[in-house]
Design a protein with these regions (language model features):
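Substrate-binding cleft of secreted/luminal carbohydrate-active enzymes
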Residues: 112, 137-186
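Acidic (Asp/Glu)-rich catalytic clusters
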Residues: 23-31, 65, 92-102, 127-134, ...
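Short, acidic/polar
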Residues: 13-27, 83-98, 154-163
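Extracytoplasmic low-complexity repetitive segments enriched in small/polar residues
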Residues: 19, 23, 57-58, 117, ...
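Surface-exposed charge patches in extracellular/virion surface proteins
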Residues: 15, 31, 64-69, 101, ...
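Acidic-and-aromatic substrate-binding clefts and catalytic sites of carbohydrate-active enzymes
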Residues: 5-15, 42-50, 75-89, 112-123, ...
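Aromatic- and acid-rich polysaccharide-binding/catalytic face
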Residues: 1, 32-39, 72-76, 86-123, ...
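Substrate-binding cleft and catalytic face of glycoside hydrolase catalytic domains
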Residues: 1-80
């Protein structure tokens, strides 16, 4: 269950986010298996890093206190960030506490080639690097897609056919606009 899309994170104080986490958990705990405690958590649009880390950590502690599964989604932004402090690996190493690095159940990556100068990552190397930081977490692609209509089929084929052998890599490949893009009208 996504607690809050990254787009809205900067509209919540830490207390409001904490209240939201508690409310969502108490309402939906019987229906949600995995709780996404931070969506595109290193995104430059989320607000002050100190506040973002406080929100993420609070959510993690709340969900883990119920022995529930946690996930975090990182925004892959190789060479397309405004502030180098927000580069995905750098941000994760510097801002995610050690107990979360060893305790997160899932770590997902959000990536849109359109956002990053059409860069196509070496996914094997990238997932291997993530596994080093999060050795106990299951890894995957939490969001991908494109707004370029003529490229959607090509992108889908590329992402869904990836063969990544990193330990604990589970796949994912959650195409952001799947319902719309995969309908028979396309």
């Amino acid at each position: 269950g996504e607690l809050l899309d990254s787009y809205y994170m900067n509209q919540y104080t830490t207390q409001q986010y904490t209240d939201r986490v508690n409310e969502y958990y108490n309402t939906l705990c019987s229906k949600v298996d995995i709780w996404e405690i931070g969506n595109e958590i290193n995104g430059e649009w989320l607000g002050n890093t100190t506040d973002v880390v406080a929100k993420m950590t609070s959510a993690y502690n709340i969900i883990k206190s119920h022995n529930a599964k946690t996930a975090i989604t990182l925004y892959y932004n190789y060479n397309c960030w405004s502030n180098p402090q927000n580069e995905m690996f750098r941000w994760a190493i510097q801002n995610i506490p050690a107990n979360m690095k060893s305790g997160l159940d899932y770590v997902w990556v959000s990536y849109y080639e359109d956002d990053c100068n059409n860069y196509q990552p070496n996914w094997q190397r990238m997932m291997d690097s993530l596994h080093t930081i999060f050795p106990n977490s299951k890894l995957g692609i939490g969001e991908c897609g494109t707004s370029i209509v003529s490229q959607k089929t090509q992108y889908m084929q590329r992402y869904y056919k990836m063969n990544i052998t990193t330990p604990n890599f589970k796949g994912g490949y959650f195409w952001r606009s799947n319902r719309r893009d995969c309908s028979t009208s396309i």
